[in-house]
């Protein structure tokens, strides 16, 4: 919660915390409790429509949207939020699976990959406002053994998300030398 509050205080985001209000210690913050939210019934109907082809009935859909991951993803899908942060208490696979089931992937995306961004403390590379440039670590665990084509697509997508081509390097991989040729891709 501290990160969300800091982002809000810095004017970087309008944060919505998802969870039980009595468990969220964030005075003045917006809190959505999926168990009591006015949005839950509508979210349950939408989620049921999305997943009924997989055998999900209305009761299971309602139970699912009362979980923080699904509720947060529904906030994004339905336009109440522009993004969601999850993973501190959920596995990467749970976060990604939920996002795919609720939000889906971009129509032009051939695959789903992941990244995380690190913002180092103030450094010579910081801008005039003291903000450091993000270091983006792409697909650190979702596409385990990418082909050269997949690796190139992941790198291009990550650079595009940052608004420029950026510079990048490829770190070591357990499969070693047979992957080194991919750097030229």
Question: Which residues does each predicted region cover?
Answer:
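Anion-binding alpha/beta catalytic cores of soluble intermediary-metabolism enzymes, centered on
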Residues: 1-17, 21-185
């Amino acid at each position: 919660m501290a990160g969300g509050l800091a982002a809000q205080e810095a004017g970087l985001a309008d944060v919505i915390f998802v969870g039980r209000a009595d468990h969220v210690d964030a005075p003045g913050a917006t809190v959505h409790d999926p168990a009591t939210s006015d949005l839950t019934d509508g979210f349950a109907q939408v989620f049921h429509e999305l997943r009924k082809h997989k055998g999900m009935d209305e009761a299971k859909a309602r139970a699912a949207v009362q979980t923080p991951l699904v509720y947060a993803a529904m906030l994004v899908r339905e336009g109440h939020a522009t993004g969601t942060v999850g993973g501190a208490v959920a596995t990467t696979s749970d976060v990604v699976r939920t996002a795919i089931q609720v939000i889906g992937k971009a129509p032009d995306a051939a695959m789903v990959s992941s990244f995380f961004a690190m913002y180092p403390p103030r450094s010579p590379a910081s801008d005039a406002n003291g903000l450091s440039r993000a270091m983006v670590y792409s697909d650190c665990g979702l596409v385990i053994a990418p082909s050269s084509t997949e690796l190139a697509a992941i790198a291009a997508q990550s650079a595009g998300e940052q608004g420029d081509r950026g510079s990048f390097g490829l770190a070591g991989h357990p499969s070693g030398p047979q992957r080194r040729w991919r750097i030229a891709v």
